Design a protein with these regions (language model features):
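Extended amphipathic alpha-helical heptad-repeat regions
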Residues: 7-77
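Extended, regular secondary-structure scaffolds
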Residues: 213-393
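Generic, well-ordered alpha-helical scaffold segments in large soluble proteins
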Residues: 140, 144, 160-167, 246, ...
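N-terminal-proximal low-complexity accessory segments that begin disordered
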Residues: 1-9, 75-187, 192-194
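Long, contiguous, structured domain-core segments that constitute the functional module of a protein
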Residues: 325-481, 485, 541-544
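C-terminal edge-of-domain segments
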Residues: 514-557
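Short, hydrophobic/π-rich interface segment
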Residues: 481-506
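Core mixed alpha/beta domains of very large multi-subunit molecular machines
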Residues: 161-180, 191-216, 235-246
Length: 557
């Protein structure tokens, strides 16, 4: 095979020698030209140097011609080699003969397209050399693919679509549970909301409110998921405030995410560093943010954090690529090269799971209460000391103390369960900051109205009352008739027992309910309706204490 690939008898060493001679001739040309520049005004030296340049250029030209001739001579005729290999084989084994023909053709192809001289590998197999060449190309392709996958713009796009994939495949859609996708960039959404004179003149309001909640036969939305991370900029706060107005008008809670910049951080991996988060939010930079939290519409806004690992890095041991060998370069624990997504997708999946199981959406928090997020992507890598560690699939592990701080500040944190592939939402706090009253009852009502599980259920009652009473328009019903009708209807969702199990309470979300209907004095035939709802309270926190005594005291009354 070696002789057939080099029909002129030239060896690889001869071709290397010609290539080396050509490089030396080029170096001589450069040296001769330097001598001309150094000759100065001495005519004799300058003339001698110019003659040296001519000789060097001539020698270089001759060396190049010889090298080109040898290169052409070593390029074999592919078909001739293949035919010769088959004809001269003499081996009846068809597989072996075809192998020899394939080796010859591959060798000819490589010799024709590569500048380097062709040499057989130590094994003598041409397919082995081809494998080495393919591996080299795979490495080059992997570098290019790493640059694409780790580009910030591409990561944002991939994270959105993988988050949507996660939500769809973790939702039991049916005729009672539907997902709708509204494709619009943040810039388009901002333009729509800012150009509208009032929020109810925007296209978003028409899509969310008028076309469904405000239309006879429409299907009001239970909640909205906006795939964006809100920071502290004036643009983000302006859009968030207008989104809250739309959500409040349609009684449709808005789910979204908080950006690390909202906390003054570069990434959520730095979240454990600040000693006191409350102190950060009391600075002058957060004046507009604090003002937004005090508005009633902010109770319809929920911001989640930190992030979810949307996929494992590509690789043979994690997520193999079928078309070629690819090991994604993620550089250990550095978070920038991993694909992080919006945690609001996980909260939305908890909401749809609760509705599919119970028909209501109160059971969305707590590890055993419907807030568990399972089957997270856990990536394990080896450190320089040889120890195998797991990357936190929620980007950062949040302690109980920090989770309480975040909840008090109006955020819902996804808490990772150590040494597992599970996490859970324990808080149900919306962005709204409950006002403080002098009455304990008023303070309790304010805190309840700022929690997402209760708000989701209350919003659905508001949707039903409007849709159902719209059907009664034109009928001969008095205020007492309307009140009796609505109280009978709402009583079917009331469970008076406090000792019932969690599953029963999830199906009957109200502990008490009452509907008051009164006539509008200035508008005959029009009634005003006020609905009072008392949900089954969920465990928020538990303070435990231990006392060591020699004698047990009597139980406290």
């Amino acid at each position: 095979l070696q002789k057939m690939l080099f029909p002129t008898g030239d060896s690889v060493s001869e071709l290397d020698a010609l290539r080396k001679a050509y490089k030396e001739a080029l170096a001589s040309v450069d040296a001769a030209r330097d001598a001309v520049s150094k000759a100065g005004e001495d005519q004799e030296k300058q003339k001698a140097a110019e003659e040296g340049v001519q000789r060097a250029e001539t020698a270089a030209s001759e060396a190049k011609e010889k090298l080109d001739e040898k290169r052409k001579a070593k390029r074999p005729d592919t078909e001739a080699i293949a035919a010769a290999m088959v004809r001269n084989s003499g081996d009846p084994d068809e597989d072996k003969r075809q192998r020899e023909v394939a080796d010859a053709r591959l060798a000819a192809c490589l010799a024709e397209h590569e500048d380097n001289p062709f040499t057989l590998p130590a094994s003598g197999s041409m397919l082995g050399m081809l494998t080495e060449r393919v591996a080299c190309k795979d490495k080059l392709l992997a570098c290019q693919l790493d640059a694409i996958l780790h580009a910030e713009a591409f990561q944002e796009l991939e994270a959105v679509w993988r988050g949507l994939h996660y939500l769809v495949f973790n939702t039991e859609t049916s005729d009672r549970l539907k997902l709708r996708l509204f494709n619009a960039s943040f810039k388009e959404l901002r333009t729509d909301l800012e150009r509208a004179v009032e929020f109810d003149q925007s296209l978003l309001f028409k899509r969310v409110y008028e076309e469904e909640y405000g239309t006879f036969g429409g299907e009001p939305y239970s909640c909205l998921l906006h795939v964006h991370e809100y920071g502290l900029s004036a643009v983000d706060l302006g859009v968030l405030q207008k989104m809250a107005e739309v959500a409040a008008a349609a009684h449709t809670p808005l789910l979204s995410a908080a950006s690390p910049q909202l906390f003054g951080l570069g990434s959520f991996t730095d979240l454990p560093l600040p000693r006191d988060l409350h102190k950060i939010f009391q600075s002058a930079d957060y004046i507009e943010w604090r003002s937004f939290r005090e508005k009633d519409d902010s109770r319809y806004v929920t911001l989640c954090l930190p992030h979810l690992l949307m996929r494992l890095p590509y690789g043979n041991d994690t997520d193999p690529v079928e078309t070629f060998v690819y090991e994604e370069d993620v550089a250990g624990p550095s978070p920038d090269r991993y694909l992080w997504g919006n945690a609001a997708f996980a909260l939305a999946a908890c909401i749809t799971a609760a509705f599919a199981k119970y028909g209501w959406t109160a059971a969305i928090r707590g590890y055993e209460g419907g807030g568990a997020v399972e089957n997270l992507n856990v990536y394990k890598y080896r450190q320089t000391n040889g120890e195998t560690v797991a990357l936190c699939p929620t980007e950062v592990s949040i302690t109980d103390r920090r989770e309480k701080e975040l909840s008090d500040l109006g955020f819902i944190a996804l808490i990772y369960r150590k040494n597992s592939d599970k996490a859970a939402f324990f808080s149900g706090q919306t962005v709204h900051k409950p006002p403080v009253y002098t009455s304990d009852t008023a303070n309790a009502n304010a805190r309840i109205s700022a929690r997402l599980p209760y708000l989701l259920n209350a919003s659905r009652f508001a949707h039903y009352v409007k849709a159902n009473m719209r059907d009664k328009v034109g009928s001969f019903m008095t205020a007492d008739n309307v009140s009796k009708y609505l109280n009978n209807w709402i009583s079917q969702y009331v469970l008076l027992s406090d000792d019932a199990g969690d599953d029963i309470k999830a199906r009957y979300p109200l502990r008490e309910a009452r509907v008051d209907v009164s006539e509008d004095p200035g508008n005959p035939g029009a009634y005003k309706c006020v609905i009072f709802l008392r949900p089954h309270f969920q465990l928020e926190e538990l303070t435990a204490s231990i006392r060591l005594v020699a004698e047990l005291p009597p139980p406290a009354v």
